[in-house]
Amino acid sequence: MPKVSDTDLAERKVEILSGARHCFATYGYDGATVARLEETIGKSRGAIFHHYGNKDQLFLEVAHEDMRKMAELAADEGLIGAIRTLVKSNDLTDWWGMRVEITRRVNIDPCFAAKWELDQLALRETVRTRLREQRASGRIRKDVEIETIAQTLELVLEGVLGRLAQRQGTEGLSDALDFVESALRSPGH
């Protein structure tokens, strides 16, 4: 049996997660049958579930990967910057569709909700760490608590998610995000 390089293995996992994201976003968790996953991903069930033991693990890994990406963007660009990047993204439909399905699963599956909450905590901490750094550098207001600013940003994220989930489009979002950013900045920044 030929040895598969770590690079090839990583590429296969990326392909599987990308295809699974599209399938879950298109059909929902329940509608993403194994046959649909195979068709969308372009790999056999054996190849898919060799890496991810079952559909639950695959869904959780896609959700985890999306949250990791969001936390990475938030660490680099702030939460508003992360929202901007995602809104401009080519895979926007799949990302937002997956996010809607994650929200649905959180509401009906306590086990999934508990695992998802761990990823949410990581994002929350990333956002708060970035806000503390921004405050220390004088870029954001000092007259509002960090927790209040963080909750405001989380509400903005959820509002954008809701708007996009309802297919209301992105028109005007950039201006709204500019407004939120300017409201949080220190005078002169």
Curated annotation (Swiss-Prot):
It comes from the Bacteria. SUPFAM superfamilies: Homeodomain-like (SSF46689), Tetracyclin repressor-like, C-terminal domain (SSF48498). Signal peptide: none annotated. The keyword Cell cycle does not apply. InterPro entries: Homeodomain-like_sf, HTH_TetR, Tet_transcr_reg_TetR-rel_C_sf. Gene3D superfamilies: Tetracycline Repressor, domain 2. Pfam families: TetR_N (PF00440). Citrate binds at residues 79-80, 130, 134, 185. GO terms for molecular function: DNA binding; magnesium ion binding. Keywords: DNA-binding, Magnesium, Metal-binding, Repressor, Transcription, Transcription regulation. GO terms for biological process: regulation of DNA-templated transcription. Residues 33-52 bind DNA. Mg(2+) binds at residue 181. Residues 10-70 form the HTH tetR-type domain. Homodimer. AcnR negatively controls the expression of the aconitase gene acn. This is HTH-type transcriptional repressor AcnR. It comes from Corynebacterium jeikeium (strain K411). The lineage of its organism: Bacteria, Bacillati, Actinomycetota, Actinomycetes, Mycobacteriales.
